[in-house]
Amino acid sequence: MRYIPPVPYEEEVWFYEELDENVYLIKMIPGIKPRILRSVFENYDCIIVESFGVGGIPQSIADDFYKLCQEFPDRLVVMSTQVAHEGSDMTVYEVGHDMKKYCRFLESYDMTLESVIAKVMWMLGNREALGGNLEDIFYSK
C-alpha cells in the first residue's frame, strides 16, 4: 500500500557529490565562554548557532560575537533554535535584534537543525556548481 503516489520526474537530474564538512554547530547554554567563539570562527567555514528560544544568545558573549562576525566576514553564520516547533526569529529578543544590525547571518526559521546542517554542507561543497549567492540558495533550494 502506498500513501503517497509516485510522481514522475521529467527534468534532468543533477547529482552533487561534494560536501564541505568544515561546519560547526554551537549550542548556546547559560555560562558559555566567549573564548570558544574565536576558535570556532578561526577554524570553520560555517558556524550554525543553536540559540535560546526563538532567537536569543547570551548577552555575555554578544559583543565578542559581533566582533568576530566583523573580523571573519567570509564565514557563513546560520542562526537556529532549540525550540522545535516555533522556528527562529532573531527580532524577538533585544540581543538578536541587535545582531541583525551588526552581523550578516542566515536564519533557519522553520527548518530542522538536521536539514540546516545537510543544506549548508551541500551548499558550501558545491558553491561553484550551484552559482549564485549563498543566501538565495539557502532559502530557495
What are the roles of these predicted feature ranges?
Residues M1-G56, S140-K141:
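Accessory alpha-helical/coil subdomains and C-terminal extensions
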Residues Q59-K141:
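ATP/nucleoside-binding phosphotransfer catalytic cores, i.e., glycine-rich phosphate-binding loops
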